[in-house]
Amino acid sequence: MAFQDNSLFPHYNVLENIKFGAERNKKKKGIEINDLIKFLHIDHVIDKFPHQISSGEAQRASLARSLLSNPDLLLLDEPLSNIDQSFKEEIQVKLKQILTEQKITTIIVTHDSYEAFYLGTKCGIILDGQLKQYDDPYNVYHFPNSIEVVNFLNRGILIPAKV
């Protein structure tokens, strides 16, 4: 699990926090720790403690810890919300690759519709505690089933009408 608040252990440095994930699932072969550290652009902070790094770096360290555990099911709550735009897209591409290659079933909670549509194979729109639409991302985006979903996606829709 990776949460928006990062949930890093304050008494561990970044590297120790990430390695904690590896201890959770030694039986499954997963991604290498050095590859994760490089692709998440946190190699320059591995010796620092959580209070010494930015929120984006902490979020990436938390994501690395979660991925390193190579789980069967992964819950991500706003996993990229604090990440700088300069490498957010690169991380999305690599994250999708890892989740696909490692066959990790992932539930992603996000307000970023691009992120949901890019990373997801299924997409659910929940408004006011109710599931309004659940489908593949293409259908949710191109064929929203209600005005509520259209408004949530922040895009206009042309409706043929006679005046």
PLM features: residue spans?
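Internal alpha/beta loop-helix hairpins
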Residues: 100, 110-163
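Conserved ABC ATPase signature
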Residues: 49-53, 57-59
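Catalytic Walker B motif of ABC-type/P-loop ATPase nucleotide-binding domains
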Residues: 74-78
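Conserved ABC ATPase "signature" region
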Residues: 28-45, 97, 103
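A short, proline-enriched helix->beta-strand linker immediately N-terminal to the Walker B motif
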Residues: 68-72
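Hydrophobic anchor residue at the start of the ABC signature
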Residues: 63
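Short helical segment in ABC ATPase nucleotide-binding domains corresponding to the A-loop/adjacent helical element
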Residues: 15-23, 30, 47
